[in-house]
Structure formats: C-alpha cells, structure tokens
Design a protein with these regions (language model features):
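Core catalytic lobe of class I
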Residues: 2-34, 54-313
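Extended, non-core accessory segments
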Residues: 38-39
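Intrinsically disordered, low-complexity PEST-like regions enriched in Ser/Thr and acidic residues
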Residues: 42-54
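Short, conserved SAM-binding/catalytic segment
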Residues: 51-60, 315-329
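Conserved SAM/SAH-binding loop
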Residues: 68-72, 331-336
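Short, flexible loop/turn segments with low-complexity composition
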Residues: 224-230, 325-335
Length: 337
C-alpha cells in the first residue's frame, strides 16, 4: 500500500513536470519552426547543445528508493515506467554480501534464471508499450578448479535474452561493451584460468559485457516539441553511442560493490532510451548509479535494493551527488516488507 501510494504520487508529480517542460527550453530555441528540420540542426550546434544540457539539469525530478525484494514490485502501476535500466546479480561468481534473498547466492543456474524471471515479468507489466528493459550483464566464467577440471563459460546473456523473449519481450541487437575489468572477479586463480602465455590453446579472456535490449511490443511515442528539444543528443554523441561496440568506458571501482557499472555508461543509456520527464526503474539499484544518472538528466526514477548495506550507500551517494550538482531532485526512501 505504501509503495502504491508513493508510486502514484511520483507519477502525478511526473505528469505535472512534463506539462511544464516548455519553460525550461532555452529562449533562443523556443521558436523552432518545423521540428523535422530543427532537431537535426540543434544536434549539430555545440552552443545549442550546451544550453540544453544546462537547462535539463534544472528540471525538477522525483526519485523513490525502496529497500526491498524486486521479485515483488506489485505496488508499481502498470505502464508507469518508460525505461528499465539495471545490472542483475551475477550467478554465484561475484562476491555479494550475505543478505537474505540475495539472488547472486542461488546455486542452481536454472533456479537463478527463474528467480530473475519474476523480476523481468514485473518490469514488463510496469513498462509502457514500446518501453525497453536494458540489462548490463556479463557471462560467467568457471575455472577448472570449480568446474571439474573444465574451463566453461555460462552464457548468462543469452539465457536472459531467451527467458525475456518467452515473457513477451522482443529481442533487439545488444551493445557489446569492451571493458577493462578486474580478473580476480572474473575467475578464481587468475592467470591459471587464462592458460600459459605464448602457447597454443589458451583461453580467451572474458573482457566484454553485453548491454541487452529487450523491448515491450507497442507503438512508438510522440512527445511534444519541448520534450524532444530537451532530450536532443548531440550529433557527435549520437554517432558514437548508437553503434554496437563500445570501448573507452572503463569499469567502475569494485571497492563498495562487487559488480558496479560506471556512471558514464548509465548516463548514455538513460539519454539514449528515455525522454526528459520520463521515469526510469532499476530493480537492482546497488549503490544508485541509475538513479544519479536519471536525476542528472531530468528523468524521474524508482530503485529497489534488497541489501540494507548497499541501500544505505545508495541513499548517501544519491543525496550527496544530487545536492552538490543540482538542487531540483526530490528523494523518497521507504522499506517494502
């Protein structure tokens, strides 16, 4: 009940903010003429892009942080979320804290996928038609020591794609993120897993992650001109971001969380697949990267985190980063039993 009330409040606030977005459009861009020609012109003009980015940082946003299990997000209103952006727990590999309900500790792979399905099903229901579930995930490498003397890769990314397809999502082409990661987290034993240097038959190092694109079937949205202008991506960034292989975005520090993803990556994805004023859901909030990105770029957000330690870290981080960078974000925190 508390979650439903909070979510309803957030959606009412979001609707009010969307209705007033025109006041944040820079005056010099307020009279654009034909949007079909004006938007590309703005995207190629560096000064216009700077004006828009400064304006977006002033858009009021609302963020609900819930300490609870995302396998039960029943309080979310159907079709109330425009984008789901998350990085789910890694099956058995990452060093998660010992908290009740932690999916990363489920030992059976098929059961792990079934538990994830409970989350994806509710994401599907919460998404608007045409909305996307974007899932940042890497495959799981098992060393010889932990897998009966056999090197094995468990294809977590393809398992999630197949399960999401069966739940009703449309699979779209993923982005391949080439990242520099900490090999100690990829496999126990370090170099012994990768094989002997300079000799044949070594094992290829696992240094990519997949950014999966799962789309809920439905039409394409037609936001008003103010929303379009405030959501414009520069021509330079559009060319760099909308390609299938990403490099140059380094992995985030694992000091506070075993499987973080960098703020730059989250900011890109928030801007690529949502509009200013939209609501972004992260069912595995961790330390709050998705929420910080949403707040910075004029989106509302909802986050769930089951681990009380990470939840507190997320609260602290989001409070600090939103207050230091901009003062238009309103944060709501609650526990869901």
């Amino acid at each position: 009940m508390y979650l439903a009330a909070k979510n309803k409040f957030q959606q009412e606030q979001s609707a009010k903010e969307n209705a007033g977005l025109s006041r944040y459009v820079p005056e010099v861009l307020a009279k654009l003429g034909d949007p079909q020609t004006a938007i590309p012109r703005i995207a190629k003009d560096a000064q216009s892009i700077r004006l828009i980015e400064r304006a977006v940082h002033q858009v009021p946003t609302s963020h609900s942080l819930y300490r609870g299990d995302s396998r039960d997000m029943s309080g979310l209103e159907p079709q109330s979320v425009h984008l789901v952006l998350t990085s789910p727990p890694y099956w058995t590999l990452k060093e998660y804290r010992d908290s009740e309900g932690q999916l990363g500790h489920v030992e059976d792979y098929d059961q792990f996928l079934q538990e994830l399905d409970k989350v994806w099903k509710q994401c599907f229901q919460a998404l608007v038609p045409g909305g996307r579930l974007i899932c940042v995930v890497g495959d799981v490498c098992l060393s010889r020591r932990e897998n009966g003397g056999r090197h094995t890769v468990v294809p977590l990314h393809s398992s999630i794609q197949e399960h999401c397809r069966k739940l009703g999502f449309d699979n779209l082409a993923p982005i391949i993120w080439h990242k520099i990661s900490n090999a100690a987290y990829e496999v126990e034993g370090g170099s012994t897993f990768l094989g002997k240097p300079y000799e044949p038959n070594a094992v290829i190092k696992n240094d990519i992650e997949f950014i999966l694109m799962e789309r809920k079937p439905g039409g394409y949205r037609a936001p008003d001109i103010s929303t379009k202008v405030l959501s414009v991506i520069s021509a330079e960034n559009h060319k760099k971001w909308f390609q299938q292989i990403w490099s140059g975005v380094t992995g985030a520090s694992t000091r506070q969380h075993p499987a973080p993803y960098p703020l730059e990556l989250a900011e890109r994805l928030v801007r690529m697949f949502s509009f200013v004023g939209d609501t972004v859901l992260d069912p595995f909030m961790g330390t709050g990267t998705t929420t910080v990105s949403a707040a910075k770029w004029g989106r509302n957000s909802i986050g769930f985190e089951i681990d009380p330690h990470y939840y507190k870290l997320a609260q602290k981080r989001i409070s600090e980063e939103t207050s230091s960078l901009f003062s238009t974000a309103v944060i709501h925190s609650a526990r869901v039993d």
